[in-house]
Amino acid sequence: LDDPRVTAIGLHIEGFGDLPAWQALSRKAHTKGIPLVALKVGKSIEARNATISHTASLAGSDAGANALLEHLGIARVDDLPTLLETLKILHVAGPLPSGQIASISCSGGEASLIADMAHDTTLTFPPLTDLQETRLLAALGPKVALANPLDYHTYIWRDVAAMTRAFSAMIVPEIAITFLIVDFPRGDICDPSDWECVIQSALDTRAATGGTIAMVSTLPELMPEHVARRLMAGGIIPMGGIRAALAATEAAHLRAPSPADLIVPSKSMPAETISEADAKRALQKAGVTVPKLLTGDLETLAKHADIQHGPFVLKSTGVAHKSEVGGVALSLTSGDAVRQAGAKMSSATFILEEMIADPVAEILIGVVKDPAHGFVITIGAGGLFAELLKDTASILMPASRDHLKQTLNRLKLSKIFNGYRNQPAGNIDALLDAVEAIQSYVLANLDT
């Protein structure tokens, strides 16, 4: 970090170890304007086992690793090619301000290919602005369909001035990076001189506009090293392979470490499981709003149901996943209904809760003490959809309310509790209050 030649740092991580040292590293790097990007292994059980077997690393959960890297402001990539391509972007251009991209190619096939490959990413191709369309029309004429991604055909190939005007027309401040898709032939079996025009046009465009430009080959082997060196010397990012280029562009977004200090987990004590009723009472004291509940034998609860008239939820006790064993009965409105439901459950004691009518969504909120990474808050789709959708997001404690809200909005389920298709929206503030209260409870009981 103290070497003035260093512009970005790539890391291969098996385990983290000293968490405060990682936090100090990330903060110093951010202060110096040196972005960090990591290839963190350990997504699979096999990789975690391999890590433990040949190093002293504590593997921890992958969700915890993701949360820690996010907390540190370190980008995470999945493979070596993407790591290298990300470092190229960071070295030449620095972190990108957004995921808005443009693409220019002389083939409709390449334009379609990059559009499809970007479909499942967070990157977007903004529609052309009026200014872009005016400039492109002047440079390309009426025969070219103007769009982003752009297929500029080959009408102007070999005309460096015209190609430069067309490329420059796509460069606008709203675009974080512009891709020029070019495949170079092998110099030992082909004459590459006909590609000189596109290299020079790209360099001239960069000099004229100052825009962030990457020349991308469809396959890694189609970007010769001598061309890459020449492009980089001219301020253009040479990239091998469209998929790796897109993944690298996602990873190269502007990031910053969290201002909150990491919580280093203490040595774990023997775990003690408390009952659902006791857990809810403890959380209620911490500020979490919970349904009114009673515990007791079936007849006592049935008599209560006759007086209060519900609707109620009846639950058996002693089983974690109650729905899988028929341990939950919903929408009970009388004592007889409670008796009939309880008779089908193998339990001596029960929980009777008031039932929330017409919920917008069920949300799972969990906290795990991950010895390798810290205390991990997971928020996601709950109830029936918890394991079916696997729609969750995890962050490290302590987390600010704004960070928690951003995490909620990363969920697919967020469309529902924001009011999907004119359906009633959920109370986001109440949900955030609950998450903050649960976080406060954990912070008050870190060593228990």
Predicted segments — roles?
Residues 1-448:
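Catalytic-core regions of core metabolic enzymes
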